[in-house]
Protein backbone atom coordinates (compact mmCIF):
# COMPACT_ATOMS: atom_id res chain seq x y z
CA UNK A 1 0.00 0.00 0.00
CA UNK A 2 3.01 2.32 0.39
CA UNK A 3 2.90 3.49 -3.24
CA UNK A 4 -0.86 4.02 -3.07
CA UNK A 5 -0.40 6.09 0.09
CA UNK A 6 1.95 8.46 -1.75
CA UNK A 7 -0.60 8.88 -4.55
CA UNK A 8 -3.41 9.10 -2.00
CA UNK A 9 -2.59 12.75 -1.42
CA UNK A 10 -4.00 13.47 -4.90
CA UNK A 11 -7.27 11.70 -4.06
CA UNK A 12 -7.52 13.54 -0.73
CA UNK A 13 -7.06 16.92 -2.43
CA UNK A 14 -9.74 16.10 -5.01
CA UNK A 15 -12.17 14.93 -2.32
CA UNK A 16 -11.52 18.02 -0.18
CA UNK A 17 -12.76 20.08 -3.13
CA UNK A 18 -15.97 18.08 -3.53
CA UNK A 19 -14.90 15.57 -6.19
CA UNK A 20 -14.95 11.78 -6.23
CA UNK A 21 -11.63 10.06 -6.92
CA UNK A 22 -10.41 6.46 -6.93
CA UNK A 23 -7.46 4.31 -7.90
CA UNK A 24 -8.41 2.29 -11.01
CA UNK A 25 -7.11 -0.14 -13.58
CA UNK A 26 -4.06 -2.38 -13.60
CA UNK A 27 -2.57 -1.15 -10.33
CA UNK A 28 -5.71 -2.16 -8.40
CA UNK A 29 -5.82 -5.51 -10.20
CA UNK A 30 -2.15 -6.20 -9.41
CA UNK A 31 -2.63 -5.12 -5.79
CA UNK A 32 -5.43 -7.69 -5.41
CA UNK A 33 -3.35 -10.39 -7.14
CA UNK A 34 -0.31 -9.40 -5.06
CA UNK A 35 1.87 -8.68 -8.08
CA UNK A 36 4.41 -5.84 -8.42
CA UNK A 37 2.47 -2.66 -9.15
CA UNK A 38 3.24 -0.58 -12.24
CA UNK A 39 1.78 2.83 -13.01
CA UNK A 40 -0.89 4.05 -10.60
CA UNK A 41 -3.88 5.66 -12.33
CA UNK A 42 -6.63 7.74 -10.75
CA UNK A 43 -10.16 8.32 -12.05
CA UNK A 44 -12.13 11.32 -10.84
CA UNK A 45 -15.40 13.19 -11.28
CA UNK A 46 -13.36 16.42 -11.59
CA UNK A 47 -13.07 17.86 -15.10
CA UNK A 48 -9.56 18.26 -16.56
CA UNK A 49 -9.54 22.04 -16.03
CA UNK A 50 -10.54 21.50 -12.39
CA UNK A 51 -7.70 19.00 -11.94
CA UNK A 52 -5.18 21.40 -13.46
CA UNK A 53 -6.38 24.21 -11.19
CA UNK A 54 -5.90 22.07 -8.08
CA UNK A 55 -2.46 20.76 -9.06
CA UNK A 56 -0.07 23.41 -10.41
CA UNK A 57 2.53 20.73 -11.21
CA UNK A 58 0.81 18.98 -14.08
CA UNK A 59 1.23 17.99 -17.73
CA UNK A 60 -1.91 18.20 -19.95
CA UNK A 61 -1.15 15.07 -21.99
CA UNK A 62 -4.58 14.04 -23.27
CA UNK A 63 -7.17 16.65 -22.46
CA UNK A 64 -9.52 15.43 -25.20
CA UNK A 65 -9.65 12.11 -23.32
CA UNK A 66 -9.77 13.82 -19.93
CA UNK A 67 -6.24 12.87 -18.88
CA UNK A 68 -3.85 15.09 -16.93
CA UNK A 69 -0.51 13.91 -15.51
CA UNK A 70 -0.15 15.20 -11.96
CA UNK A 71 3.30 15.31 -10.38
CA UNK A 72 3.21 14.34 -6.71
CA UNK A 73 6.49 14.08 -4.76
CA UNK A 74 8.31 13.89 -8.09
CA UNK A 75 6.21 10.93 -9.30
CA UNK A 76 3.85 11.23 -12.31
CA UNK A 77 0.26 9.97 -11.94
CA UNK A 78 -2.39 9.90 -14.67
CA UNK A 79 -5.59 11.52 -13.43
CA UNK A 80 -8.50 10.96 -15.81
CA UNK A 81 -12.04 12.30 -15.65
CA UNK A 82 -14.86 9.73 -15.48
CA UNK A 83 -15.99 9.26 -19.06
CA UNK A 84 -18.12 7.28 -21.44
CA UNK A 85 -17.37 6.65 -25.07
CA UNK A 86 -19.79 6.84 -27.99
CA UNK A 87 -19.85 4.61 -31.06
CA UNK A 88 -16.41 3.40 -32.10
CA UNK A 89 -14.93 4.12 -35.52
CA UNK A 90 -13.05 1.44 -37.47
CA UNK A 91 -13.21 -0.97 -34.52
CA UNK A 92 -10.48 0.96 -32.73
CA UNK A 93 -11.41 4.41 -31.44
CA UNK A 94 -14.50 6.15 -30.09
CA UNK A 95 -16.05 8.86 -32.28
CA UNK A 96 -16.37 11.01 -29.16
CA UNK A 97 -15.76 11.03 -25.42
CA UNK A 98 -18.26 12.40 -22.89
CA UNK A 99 -17.20 13.33 -19.38
CA UNK A 100 -19.57 12.05 -16.68
CA UNK A 101 -19.85 12.23 -12.90
CA UNK A 102 -20.48 8.50 -12.38
CA UNK A 103 -17.79 5.97 -11.45
CA UNK A 104 -20.03 3.13 -12.64
CA UNK A 105 -20.35 4.65 -16.13
CA UNK A 106 -16.57 5.01 -16.28
CA UNK A 107 -15.85 1.43 -15.19
CA UNK A 108 -18.51 0.06 -17.55
CA UNK A 109 -16.49 1.10 -20.63
CA UNK A 110 -13.37 -0.86 -19.64
CA UNK A 111 -12.19 -4.05 -21.30
CA UNK A 112 -12.06 -6.81 -18.67
CA UNK A 113 -13.72 -7.11 -15.26
CA UNK A 114 -10.34 -7.47 -13.52
CA UNK A 115 -9.43 -4.03 -14.92
CA UNK A 116 -12.77 -2.48 -13.93
CA UNK A 117 -12.18 -2.46 -10.18
CA UNK A 118 -11.74 0.79 -8.23
CA UNK A 119 -10.21 1.38 -4.81
CA UNK A 120 -10.42 4.36 -2.48
CA UNK A 121 -7.51 5.86 -0.57
CA UNK A 122 -8.26 3.65 2.45
CA UNK A 123 -7.95 0.44 0.45
CA UNK A 124 -11.69 -0.20 0.19
CA UNK A 125 -12.53 -2.04 -3.04
CA UNK A 126 -15.39 -0.98 -5.33
CA UNK A 127 -16.15 -3.93 -7.60
CA UNK A 128 -19.30 -3.43 -9.67
CA UNK A 129 -18.70 -6.06 -12.37
CA UNK A 130 -17.36 -9.15 -10.61
CA UNK A 131 -13.68 -8.44 -11.15
CA UNK A 132 -12.59 -9.99 -7.85
CA UNK A 133 -14.47 -13.19 -8.61
CA UNK A 134 -12.77 -13.36 -12.02
CA UNK A 135 -9.38 -12.88 -10.35
CA UNK A 136 -10.19 -15.59 -7.83
CA UNK A 137 -11.12 -17.94 -10.69
CA UNK A 138 -8.04 -16.73 -12.63
CA UNK A 139 -10.31 -15.86 -15.56
CA UNK A 140 -10.24 -13.08 -18.13
CA UNK A 141 -13.83 -11.91 -18.57
CA UNK A 142 -15.06 -8.92 -20.57
CA UNK A 143 -17.14 -6.22 -18.91
CA UNK A 144 -20.62 -6.89 -20.27
CA UNK A 145 -21.11 -8.34 -23.74
CA UNK A 146 -17.84 -9.70 -25.16
CA UNK A 147 -18.87 -9.18 -28.79
CA UNK A 148 -19.65 -5.51 -28.12
CA UNK A 149 -16.36 -4.93 -26.26
CA UNK A 150 -14.28 -6.42 -29.07
CA UNK A 151 -16.21 -4.60 -31.80
CA UNK A 152 -15.61 -1.34 -29.95
CA UNK A 153 -11.84 -1.85 -29.88
CA UNK A 154 -10.48 -4.98 -31.55
CA UNK A 155 -7.11 -4.59 -29.79
CA UNK A 156 -8.84 -5.85 -26.65
CA UNK A 157 -8.66 -9.36 -28.13
CA UNK A 158 -4.88 -9.11 -28.34
CA UNK A 159 -4.79 -7.71 -24.81
CA UNK A 160 -6.78 -10.74 -23.66
CA UNK A 161 -4.14 -13.10 -25.04
CA UNK A 162 -1.41 -10.90 -23.57
CA UNK A 163 -2.98 -11.24 -20.11
CA UNK A 164 -2.97 -15.02 -20.54
CA UNK A 165 0.81 -14.71 -20.90
CA UNK A 166 1.48 -12.11 -18.21
CA UNK A 167 -0.95 -13.39 -15.55
CA UNK A 168 -1.36 -17.06 -16.43
CA UNK A 169 -5.16 -16.62 -16.38
CA UNK A 170 -7.55 -18.45 -18.72
CA UNK A 171 -10.05 -16.87 -21.10
CA UNK A 172 -13.64 -17.20 -19.89
CA UNK A 173 -15.70 -19.27 -22.35
CA UNK A 174 -17.84 -16.48 -23.85
CA UNK A 175 -14.81 -14.18 -24.05
CA UNK A 176 -12.82 -16.82 -25.94
CA UNK A 177 -15.73 -17.58 -28.29
CA UNK A 178 -16.01 -13.87 -29.14
CA UNK A 179 -12.27 -13.69 -29.92
CA UNK A 180 -12.63 -16.64 -32.31
CA UNK A 181 -15.59 -14.98 -33.99
CA UNK A 182 -14.28 -11.41 -34.24
CA UNK A 183 -10.54 -12.02 -34.62
CA UNK A 184 -10.63 -10.67 -38.18
CA UNK A 185 -11.35 -7.19 -36.79
CA UNK A 186 -7.75 -7.09 -35.57
CA UNK A 187 -6.81 -6.26 -39.17
CA UNK A 188 -8.26 -2.77 -38.59
CA UNK A 189 -5.80 -2.06 -35.77
CA UNK A 190 -2.54 -0.16 -36.30
CA UNK A 191 0.33 -2.64 -36.25
CA UNK A 192 2.23 -0.48 -33.74
CA UNK A 193 -0.48 -1.15 -31.13
CA UNK A 194 -0.46 -4.87 -31.89
CA UNK A 195 3.34 -5.01 -31.63
CA UNK A 196 3.23 -3.56 -28.11
CA UNK A 197 0.80 -6.27 -26.99
CA UNK A 198 2.61 -9.07 -28.81
CA UNK A 199 5.91 -8.12 -27.22
CA UNK A 200 4.29 -8.29 -23.77
CA UNK A 201 2.96 -11.72 -24.74
CA UNK A 202 6.45 -12.94 -25.72
CA UNK A 203 8.03 -11.64 -22.50
CA UNK A 204 5.31 -12.82 -20.11
CA UNK A 205 6.06 -15.49 -17.48
CA UNK A 206 3.31 -17.66 -19.01
CA UNK A 207 4.38 -17.05 -22.62
CA UNK A 208 3.91 -20.72 -23.55
CA UNK A 209 0.26 -20.56 -22.47
CA UNK A 210 -0.18 -17.27 -24.36
CA UNK A 211 1.24 -18.69 -27.60
CA UNK A 212 -0.98 -21.75 -27.34
CA UNK A 213 -4.03 -19.54 -26.85
CA UNK A 214 -2.97 -17.35 -29.79
CA UNK A 215 -3.24 -20.47 -31.96
CA UNK A 216 -6.39 -21.91 -30.32
CA UNK A 217 -8.30 -18.67 -30.90
CA UNK A 218 -6.91 -18.41 -34.48
CA UNK A 219 -5.91 -14.83 -33.71
CA UNK A 220 -2.46 -15.45 -35.23
CA UNK A 221 -4.14 -15.65 -38.66
CA UNK A 222 -4.81 -11.92 -38.55
CA UNK A 223 -1.21 -10.90 -37.76
CA UNK A 224 1.34 -9.93 -40.45
CA UNK A 225 3.51 -12.80 -41.75
CA UNK A 226 2.06 -15.32 -39.27
CA UNK A 227 -0.92 -16.64 -41.21
CA UNK A 228 0.91 -19.84 -42.25
CA UNK A 229 2.76 -20.39 -38.97
CA UNK A 230 0.32 -22.40 -36.85
CA UNK A 231 2.53 -25.47 -36.37
CA UNK A 232 5.67 -23.36 -35.87
CA UNK A 233 4.03 -21.22 -33.18
CA UNK A 234 2.88 -24.38 -31.39
CA UNK A 235 6.43 -25.73 -31.69
CA UNK A 236 7.74 -22.49 -30.15
CA UNK A 237 5.37 -23.09 -27.23
CA UNK A 238 7.19 -26.35 -26.43
CA UNK A 239 10.36 -24.54 -25.36
CA UNK A 240 11.30 -22.95 -22.04
CA UNK A 241 11.13 -19.16 -22.46
CA UNK A 242 12.00 -18.33 -18.87
CA UNK A 243 15.75 -17.89 -19.50
CA UNK A 244 15.38 -14.80 -21.68
CA UNK A 245 16.32 -11.53 -20.04
CA UNK A 246 15.31 -9.08 -22.78
CA UNK A 247 12.60 -8.63 -25.38
CA UNK A 248 15.36 -8.75 -28.04
CA UNK A 249 16.05 -12.38 -27.12
CA UNK A 250 12.35 -13.25 -27.13
CA UNK A 251 11.85 -11.79 -30.61
CA UNK A 252 15.04 -13.42 -31.95
CA UNK A 253 13.92 -16.81 -30.63
CA UNK A 254 10.38 -16.38 -31.96
CA UNK A 255 11.66 -15.45 -35.43
CA UNK A 256 13.99 -18.48 -35.36
CA UNK A 257 11.08 -20.74 -34.39
CA UNK A 258 8.84 -19.58 -37.22
CA UNK A 259 11.75 -19.86 -39.67
CA UNK A 260 11.55 -16.25 -40.80
CA UNK A 261 14.07 -15.94 -43.66
CA UNK A 262 13.89 -12.15 -43.90
CA UNK A 263 13.74 -10.93 -40.29
CA UNK A 264 14.40 -7.29 -41.12
CA UNK A 265 11.43 -7.27 -43.54
CA UNK A 266 9.21 -8.88 -40.89
CA UNK A 267 10.31 -6.40 -38.22
CA UNK A 268 9.84 -3.39 -40.49
CA UNK A 269 6.32 -4.61 -41.27
CA UNK A 270 5.71 -4.75 -37.52
CA UNK A 271 7.01 -1.14 -37.29
CA UNK A 272 10.08 -1.77 -35.15
CA UNK A 273 12.62 1.01 -34.68
CA UNK A 274 15.81 0.74 -36.75
CA UNK A 275 17.82 0.32 -33.54
CA UNK A 276 15.74 -2.65 -32.41
CA UNK A 277 15.82 -4.25 -35.87
CA UNK A 278 19.61 -3.94 -35.89
CA UNK A 279 19.89 -5.62 -32.47
CA UNK A 280 17.53 -8.50 -33.24
CA UNK A 281 19.17 -9.19 -36.62
CA UNK A 282 22.63 -9.06 -34.98
CA UNK A 283 21.52 -11.67 -32.42
CA UNK A 284 20.14 -13.90 -35.20
CA UNK A 285 23.39 -13.64 -37.20
CA UNK A 286 25.43 -14.48 -34.11
CA UNK A 287 23.22 -17.53 -33.45
CA UNK A 288 23.71 -18.70 -37.03
CA UNK A 289 27.50 -18.67 -36.54
CA UNK A 290 27.22 -20.12 -33.03
CA UNK A 291 25.50 -23.19 -34.45
CA UNK A 292 28.74 -24.14 -36.23
CA UNK A 293 31.43 -22.97 -33.78
CA UNK A 294 32.24 -22.17 -30.17
CA UNK A 295 32.93 -18.64 -29.03
CA UNK A 296 36.53 -17.58 -29.57
CA UNK A 297 38.32 -14.25 -29.15
CA UNK A 298 37.73 -13.00 -32.70
CA UNK A 299 34.09 -14.16 -32.95
CA UNK A 300 33.25 -12.60 -29.59
CA UNK A 301 35.12 -9.37 -30.31
CA UNK A 302 33.39 -8.92 -33.66
CA UNK A 303 29.97 -9.70 -32.18
CA UNK A 304 30.23 -7.56 -29.04
CA UNK A 305 29.51 -8.84 -25.56
CA UNK A 306 25.87 -7.69 -25.23
CA UNK A 307 24.78 -9.28 -28.51
CA UNK A 308 26.86 -12.37 -27.71
CA UNK A 309 25.25 -12.88 -24.29
CA UNK A 310 21.76 -12.56 -25.78
CA UNK A 311 22.66 -14.90 -28.65
CA UNK A 312 24.09 -17.49 -26.26
CA UNK A 313 20.97 -17.47 -24.07
CA UNK A 314 18.78 -17.98 -27.15
CA UNK A 315 21.09 -20.70 -28.50
CA UNK A 316 21.01 -22.57 -25.18
CA UNK A 317 17.19 -22.56 -25.24
CA UNK A 318 17.24 -23.75 -28.86
CA UNK A 319 19.37 -26.80 -28.04
CA UNK A 320 17.25 -27.40 -24.92
CA UNK A 321 20.33 -27.71 -22.73
CA UNK A 322 20.26 -24.35 -20.99
CA UNK A 323 23.57 -23.99 -19.17
CA UNK A 324 24.09 -20.80 -17.18
CA UNK A 325 27.82 -21.49 -16.86
CA UNK A 326 28.16 -21.37 -20.67
CA UNK A 327 26.58 -17.92 -20.70
CA UNK A 328 28.87 -16.83 -17.85
CA UNK A 329 31.85 -18.16 -19.81
CA UNK A 330 31.02 -15.77 -22.67
CA UNK A 331 31.32 -12.84 -20.24
CA UNK A 332 34.59 -14.23 -18.77
CA UNK A 333 36.09 -14.69 -22.23
CA UNK A 334 35.17 -11.14 -23.21
CA UNK A 335 36.65 -9.76 -19.99
CA UNK A 336 39.93 -11.53 -20.79
CA UNK A 337 40.30 -10.07 -24.30
CA UNK A 338 43.45 -7.94 -24.75
CA UNK A 339 41.27 -5.33 -26.46
CA UNK A 340 37.49 -5.06 -26.47
CA UNK A 341 37.08 -2.47 -29.23
CA UNK A 342 39.26 -1.10 -32.03
CA UNK A 343 39.75 2.24 -30.28
CA UNK A 344 41.81 0.39 -27.65
CA UNK A 345 44.47 -0.58 -30.20
CA UNK A 346 47.65 1.44 -29.66
CA UNK A 347 47.98 2.13 -33.36
CA UNK A 348 45.80 3.96 -35.88
CA UNK A 349 45.51 4.45 -39.60
CA UNK A 350 47.42 7.71 -39.25
CA UNK A 351 50.31 5.82 -37.63
CA UNK A 352 50.44 3.41 -40.56
CA UNK A 353 50.50 6.29 -43.05
CA UNK A 354 53.28 8.04 -41.12
CA UNK A 355 55.43 4.87 -41.32
CA UNK A 356 55.27 4.62 -45.12
CA UNK A 357 55.22 6.66 -48.31
CA UNK A 358 52.10 4.84 -49.53
CA UNK A 359 48.97 6.82 -50.30
CA UNK A 360 45.80 6.13 -48.28
CA UNK A 361 43.64 3.28 -49.56
CA UNK A 362 41.84 0.04 -48.63
CA UNK A 363 45.19 -1.41 -47.53
CA UNK A 364 45.03 0.65 -44.30
CA UNK A 365 41.85 -1.10 -43.07
CA UNK A 366 43.24 -4.49 -44.14
CA UNK A 367 46.45 -4.03 -42.16
CA UNK A 368 44.56 -2.75 -39.11
CA UNK A 369 42.35 -5.84 -39.25
CA UNK A 370 45.40 -8.13 -39.32
CA UNK A 371 46.92 -6.29 -36.35
CA UNK A 372 43.63 -6.57 -34.51
CA UNK A 373 43.47 -10.33 -35.02
CA UNK A 374 47.07 -10.86 -33.92
CA UNK A 375 46.44 -8.90 -30.71
CA UNK A 376 43.20 -10.79 -30.03
CA UNK A 377 44.96 -14.14 -30.52
CA UNK A 378 47.63 -12.89 -28.07
CA UNK A 379 50.36 -13.34 -30.66
CA UNK A 380 51.19 -9.63 -30.60
CA UNK A 381 51.51 -7.14 -27.75
CA UNK A 382 49.25 -4.09 -27.98
CA UNK A 383 52.28 -1.76 -27.94
CA UNK A 384 53.05 0.69 -30.74
CA UNK A 385 56.70 -0.32 -31.21
CA UNK A 386 55.89 -4.03 -31.07
CA UNK A 387 53.16 -3.52 -33.67
CA UNK A 388 55.50 -1.54 -35.94
CA UNK A 389 58.16 -4.23 -35.67
CA UNK A 390 55.63 -6.94 -36.55
CA UNK A 391 54.36 -4.97 -39.57
CA UNK A 392 57.91 -4.52 -40.91
CA UNK A 393 58.73 -8.17 -40.27
CA UNK A 394 55.66 -9.24 -42.24
CA UNK A 395 56.32 -6.70 -45.03
CA UNK A 396 52.84 -5.22 -44.66
CA UNK A 397 53.89 -1.65 -45.48
UniProtKB/Swiss-Prot annotation:
Pfam families: PolyA_pol (PF01743), PolyA_pol_RNAbd (PF12627), tRNA_NucTran2_2 (PF13735). ATP binds at residues 26, 29, 110, 153, 156, 159, 162. InterPro entries: Bact_CCA-adding_enz_type3_sf (IPR050264), CCA-adding_enz_C (IPR032810), CCA-adding_enz_firmicutes (IPR023068), NT_sf (IPR043519), PolA_pol_head_dom (IPR002646), PolyA_RNA-bd (IPR032828). Mg(2+) binds at residues 39, 41. One of its GO terms (molecular function) is ATP binding. CTP binds at residues 26, 29, 110, 153, 156, 159, 162. GO terms for biological process: RNA repair; tRNA 3'-terminal CCA addition. Coiled coil: none annotated. Keywords: ATP-binding, Magnesium, Metal-binding, Nucleotide-binding, Nucleotidyltransferase, RNA repair, RNA-binding, Transferase, tRNA processing. Its EC number is 2.7.7.72. It catalyses: a tRNA precursor + 2 CTP + ATP = a tRNA with a 3' CCA end + 3 diphosphate; a tRNA with a 3' CCA end + 2 CTP + ATP = a tRNA with a 3' CCACCA end + 3 diphosphate. Its cofactor is Mg(2+). The keyword tRNA processing applies. CDD domains: NT_ClassII-CCAase (cd05398). A single active site specifically recognizes both ATP and CTP and is responsible for their addition. NCBIfam families: PRK13299.1. Homodimer. Catalyzes the addition and repair of the essential 3'-terminal CCA sequence in tRNAs without using a nucleic acid template. Adds these three nucleotides in the order of C, C, and A to the tRNA nucleotide-73, using CTP and ATP as substrates and producing inorganic pyrophosphate. tRNA 3'-terminal CCA addition is required both for tRNA processing and repair. Also involved in tRNA surveillance by mediating tandem CCA addition to generate a CCACCA at the 3' terminus of unstable tRNAs. While stable tRNAs receive only 3'-terminal CCA, unstable tRNAs are marked with CCACCA and rapidly degraded. Belongs to the tRNA nucleotidyltransferase/poly(A) polymerase family. Bacterial CCA-adding enzyme type 3 subfamily. This is CCA-adding enzyme.
Amino acid sequence: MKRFKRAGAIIETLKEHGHEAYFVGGSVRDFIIDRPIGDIDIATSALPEEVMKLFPKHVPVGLEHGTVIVLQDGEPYEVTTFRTESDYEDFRRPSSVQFVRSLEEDLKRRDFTMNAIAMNEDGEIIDLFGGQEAIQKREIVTVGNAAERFQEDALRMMRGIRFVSTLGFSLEEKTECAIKRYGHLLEHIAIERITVEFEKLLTGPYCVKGLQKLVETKLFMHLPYLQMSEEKILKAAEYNWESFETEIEAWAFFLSCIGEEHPSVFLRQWKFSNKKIKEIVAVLLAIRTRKTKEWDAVFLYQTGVQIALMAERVYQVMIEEYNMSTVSEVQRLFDSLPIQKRQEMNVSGNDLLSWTDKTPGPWVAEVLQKIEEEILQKRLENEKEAIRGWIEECNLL
